Every structure is written in C-alpha cells, then in structure tokens.
C-alpha cells in the first residue's frame, strides 16, 4: 500500500499497481504487489475492512494474476467472487491443504529461478515466467484458533506454511493479503513472527489502542495515535503504512458487492491455467439472466 506522487513514493509498473483508496493528502492512493508484497489489514466490525478487501479484489481481478481465497467463515465474504478465483477454501482443514500446495509451488519456482541464474520472478524470460499468485485471507484468527488438542497439528501446518510464504515467496511471485480484527501474540505461537513479515499495513477503526499498536508500532509508530482516533461514524477510513516509516490516512471508496461480482465475471477469462490449484477451484454459480418483457399479450375483456 503506497501513495502516489505527492506522498513521497516512487512509481511502480502499472501492471502491478491498482487503485484501492483515496489518500487524505493527495486524493490518490495505489496498492502495489512489488512495493508491499505481503500485507496485513486490521479493523473492528463495521470499520470498512471488508469494503477494503472488496476494492482489492476488484482491482486485482483486472490484472493477469491468480487470485486465491481463504475464507473460513464458510465463504460468506469471498464465494460471490468465485468467477475470478483460481482457488477458494472455506474451512481450516482445506486451508491447510491449500497452503501446503502453495509451499510446494514456491519451492518449484525457486528451482526455476536457480536454473535461469536469476533471483526474482521478474528477471525470468517472459515465456517461462510463472503467473503471480495473490492469497487473500479473510479472517486470519480462524486459522490460528483450535477447539481441541487434535487440531494442534493442523494449526502447526497452517502457521508454518504462512510463515514460509511470508518470508520467501515474494521473489517467486506469491503474495499474501491477510485481514483480521486483531493480530498479536494472543493468537498463539507464530503470530508475531508472521506479522513481522507482513510489511504493508492498513489499520481501520479498532476497539483498543493495543490493536492499533499491533498493526503499526513496528513499522510506523507515529501512526498509532491517528489509527486509535478513527471515529465509528467514518467507516472506510484507515491508516496505511509501510516499513519506510511513512504513513497516510486513507478512505476506501464505497463499492457494492454486486459491482465487484460484475468485475469478476467480466474478467473471468484472466484466470490462468494453474493445474496445482485445480483441486481447489470453486464452483461458479450460473448467472441468472435478467427478466425480459412478457411474451403473453393480454386479451381484451368482453361482456
């Protein structure tokens, strides 16, 4: 998440940047995978966090990338965007399987970089360059929480995979966009290690100052008071920061669910052919055609 000209950031390649909000200082804001390849978005209920993710999906859907959804609220947030998703999982068990596949893909892509003697996806020749993958996690706490001892092994696999991806996957074009209400040590082992790798930060209205500190104190401590004072009657307002220490107050434009669904359908042809994601490809509901004029002509009444 970075501001455009006027906020001190350098230009990014257009193919990897998309409009995601409005900067309070310049009126322009763009998020970019190459500038902030791993990101964390925090916010309380009704803070605008879901609207922010909608805008991310709307922008990313128009780019040549694979979109992967992890929505453990049974898909209520992301299932509608299935026409543009290469993969969607809605339970922690399936999330563990999907993340394991992504780690295996990461290792395979590193082998590809090694064979070509380069260190970054974008240094590869275009004809062999893999498609970037963006993983959108709707509520990260659901991946950390366990209800019984038998869930501990699954949690360990999920957390280990997320940390490995966050630490290394930028170079091979796998990116994480993680959302949650809180994200700190109270989630358990591995949470703070993962958070440290998610260098792009966006914090909406939160329920306590500690949550704002979780999201901003390690990258832009001066932004914590601004995030703590976002009022309830300003949903969509947030503070965006990055490791440079710079930050800006932003406002996510209101975007309807139907608008994002329409964009996902329009750009469904951009879904790349990635066999490793095929087992997780969501079922796309048929589009219901709009009702047309009635073909039944009324008959005149006669006595």
UniProtKB/Swiss-Prot annotation:
* Matching SUPFAM superfamilies: P-loop containing nucleoside triphosphate hydrolases
InterPro entries (UniProt xref) = FtsK/SpoIIIE/SftA, FtsK_dom, P-loop_NTPase
**UniProtKB keywords:** ATP-binding, Nucleotide-binding, Plasmid
UniProt domain FtsK: residue ranges: 26-213
The entry's ATP-binding residues are: 43-50
Question: What Gene Ontology terms describe what this protein does at the molecular function level?
Answer: ATP binding; DNA binding
Q: Tell me the disulfide pairings in this chain.
A: none
Determine the domain of life of the protein's source.
Bacteria
Q: What Pfam families does the record point to?
A: FtsK_SpoIIIE
* UniProt keyword Magnesium, yes or no: no
Function according to Swiss-Prot or TrEMBL: Involved in sporulation inhibition and pock formation.
Q: What is this protein called?
A: Sporulation regulatory protein
What organism does this protein naturally occur in?
Answer: Streptomyces azureus
